């Protein structure tokens, strides 16, 4: 693997068509390893002299924010210097020159900034449900497993097992274990395919580290934020939503909320972070594991705009689908509201739609401008009235299917983004039940006549 990666960097100096294997913008361990291993496989199995280059979809300066990535690269003895990052290759220039073919791994929707590259996408390999509205018109291979690295391991072991070296096997093995929470049946993130390929890798390379050792090491590295500034912690695992120019950042924080709130100069850091990136609000969702290795979740909303902050807090506090079961924590600062989250199965993935609806409800119910943090002439009673209208607008706008999704969730590759089987069983409408009963009643006479014969 290391020799291959060194060759990739050299290939970029040549003016020739290249195939770029591109991971997602989060560049978590699964995305990074899947891109590296899939590009390695394609380069080794393609007869023509084509160049396959894995690209990590972040700036090089952002890699230190991903502690598990840095730790694993060091453990596997892959120097960071041989990796290629998004700010080191101009994909748009290559595309305009007709020299780019894209292969997307661990995602299938390009961001708006890369929309022009969609016509260069030749293949997709992903492990999450397809968004048909934005999926590129190309060969798409999707299977709902716990880790995308499992699908890459499958392709290698089925297509060319002889090319698999210990270094690549160790990368795949550790990544699957981390994504699938050490194959813990109680967590339920690992599918049969995930388990199968972990066992296959262990059989081929018996000297791989024990499951417990590598999982514990990777999880510790992932949750280690001791050396990060507040800004780095907020950027480490962040998503952004927006509506009508209003932007809300949602950051996963890997530590106890109490410790996070006690950081020196925190409020100034939060304000500076929002101003630097033009965020109108920031939602911090903390996750850590207690002494019983159970996940603990907490949540905080920082927003200098009173009406927007109260709308967001009200929607989150009163949400029943999903129920966050929030308990407010007293705060001495009016711009910040923290909560204990009683329902630990509700991850950021489930909170994002609530925040989208909160923004919609806010704009539907009030014309209060966001130009200033506090709007003069707006009383608390007026804000409360607007909040009630926003909440009613949201609740009335939710369809039955939105309140209770019809299928259990797909296992994802991070505890931050998904927990297993927390949406309940499929729900039938009255029309569906009536149709089923009608079909049964129509079939009964036929069945009866046949029995008489």
Curated annotation (Swiss-Prot):
Subcellular location: Cytoplasm; Nucleus; Cell junction, Focal adhesion
GO molecular function per UniProt: exopolyphosphatase activity; inorganic diphosphate phosphatase activity; metal ion binding
Residue ranges, annotated region (Disordered): 396-419
Residues the record lists as binding Mn(2+) 1: 28, 106
Pfam families, per database record: DHH, DHHA2
Superkingdom of origin organism: Eukaryota
Activity regulation remarks: Activated by magnesium ions and inhibited by manganese ions. Inhibited by dipyridamole, moderately sensitive to IBMX and inhibited by vinpocetine.
Chain location of the short sequence motif DHH motif per the record: 106-108
Gene Ontology, cellular component aspect: cytoplasm; focal adhesion; nucleus
SUPFAM superfamilies to which the protein is assigned, alphabetical: DHH phosphoesterases (SSF64182)
Modified sites of kind Phosphothreonine: 410
Ranges where the record places region Essential for homodimerization: 393-420
Cofactor note: Binds 2 manganese ions per subunit.
Main location: cytoplasm
Modified residues (Phosphoserine): 399, 414
Oligomer and partners: Homooligomer. Able to homodimerize via its C-terminal domain. Interacts with NME1. Interacts with GSK3; at focal adhesion complexes where paxillin and vinculin are colocalized.
Name of the protein described by the UniProt record: Exopolyphosphatase PRUNE1
Species for this entry: Bos taurus
